[in-house]
């Protein structure tokens, strides 16, 4: 563990000119370029050819989270504009229940122009579903760099989900350096997004179209879904010299029992679409270790801590860990596992479940680049040097890669 903790983030830097960051997506999602890294060799293709590089019987896992319109703008009587960015629900802390509220919802929020919001509530008049209402935001206690914010409204026929849909703005990554456009509402969601909760898209999935999904099924792959709600922490740069000083953000995950049964039963490789699916799948192993050690743990106690994989724990096989988790779900009569993960995957980590990965090109000095480096056993430079030399587009709206170490 000590070696991993002392990794210098400066060793994971590379020059990324601004013009290589894709500010907008391509007109057709699946026309993006695909870099294929296979056992150390690099080639390039187009995303529509992805099925050609995969095998029948493989299990492909997607993150079906949906980005919410999490940015709310209020104007004070003084004229000052305050932005409230909803990060995660506090009261109720269950996403579905929070979105269903009809009078009050509390969220952990980042507040823009905080110095202009010293005290008192903010108000916004609006019409939702033809119904007039006043939304009030009241700032509570400071929680680290974020704040507790209570939202109340005076029309019980309107849910908090309705309010976000009408009043909220889709949050796009800060490095795009532009305003959100109407087209982002469609292009910054995957075609299979279902479960509301993310404040950033699982961007590896943005390339998939119905025709690519159909081609994968025709090839004989089994497609399954998990949910990880992507937090704003995904954009937080590593500011410490060594990664030991970087605190990973907690993200909420949901996995159906059927998916865990599939992971246990299938004989082919597991292909993860995106780093969020990777983090969810790899977390399942450590959740299985916890259920092995604490058979009656609550779902909250199954939370995967940042450094847990690097600490001493029973050396279960992947099958043993997944079976332990499945037994736990059967004992507790759970159809779906709801917990959270803070896992950091960096060089020194041994992958337990994921054998192939579809992912975009990530920011320099980011934890996502560490995750990729751990997967390709340090050979990330080969991939990124090729992508830079061959006009690949980078970051959220950029091109894609298939990694087969």
Q: Which positions does each model-derived feature cover?
A:
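Surface-exposed, charge/polar-rich loops and edge strands
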Residues: 1-405
């Amino acid at each position: 563990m000590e070696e991993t903790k002392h990794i210098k983030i400066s060793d994971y830097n590379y020059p990324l000119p601004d013009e290589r960051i894709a500010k907008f997506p391509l007109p057709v999602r699946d026309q993006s370029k695909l870099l294929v890294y296979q056992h150390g060799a690099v080639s390039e293709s187009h995303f529509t050819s992805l099925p050609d590089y995969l095998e029948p019987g493989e299990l492909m896992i997607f993150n079906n989270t949906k980005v919410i319109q999490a940015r709310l703008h209020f104007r004070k009587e003084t004229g000052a504009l305050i932005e409230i960015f909803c990060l995660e629900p506090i009261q109720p802390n269950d996403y579905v229940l929070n979105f269903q509220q009809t009078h009050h919802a509390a969220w952990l929020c980042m507040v823009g122009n905080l110095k202009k919001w010293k005290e008192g509530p903010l108000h916004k008049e609006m019409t939702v579903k033809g119904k007039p209402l006043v939304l009030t935001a009241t700032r509570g206690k400071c929680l680290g760099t974020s704040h507790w914010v209570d939202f109340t409204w005076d029309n019980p026929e309107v849910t908090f989900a309705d309010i976000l849909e009408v009043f909220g703005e889709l949050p796009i990554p800060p490095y795009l350096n532009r305003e959100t456009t109407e087209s982002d509402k469609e292009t910054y969601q995957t075609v299979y997004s279902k479960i509301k909760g993310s404040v950033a898209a699982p961007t590896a999935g943005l390339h998939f179209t119905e025709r690519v999904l159909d081609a994968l099924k025709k090839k004989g792959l089994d497609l399954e879904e998990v949910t990880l709600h992507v937090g704003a922490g995904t954009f937080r740069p590593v500011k410490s010299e060594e990664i030991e000083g970087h605190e990973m953000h907690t993200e909420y995950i949901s996995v159906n029992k059927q998916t865990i049964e599939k992971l246990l039963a299938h004989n082919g490789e597991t292909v993860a679409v995106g780093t969020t699916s990777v983090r969810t799948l790899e977390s399942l192993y450590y959740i299985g270790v916890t259920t092995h050690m604490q058979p009656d743990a609550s779902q909250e106690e199954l939370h995967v801590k940042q450094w847990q994989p690097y600490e001493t724990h029973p050396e279960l096989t992947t099958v043993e860990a997944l079976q332990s988790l499945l037994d736990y779900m059967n004992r507790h009569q759970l159809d779906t596992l709801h917990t959270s993960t803070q896992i950091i995957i960096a060089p020194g980590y041994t992958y337990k479940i994921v054998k192939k990965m579809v992912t975009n090109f990530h920011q320099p000095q980011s934890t996502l680049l560490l995750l990729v480096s751990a997967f390709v056993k340090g050979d990330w430079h080969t991939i990124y040097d090729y992508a830079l030399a061959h006009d690949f587009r980078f970051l959220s709206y950029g091109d894609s890669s298939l990694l087969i170490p």
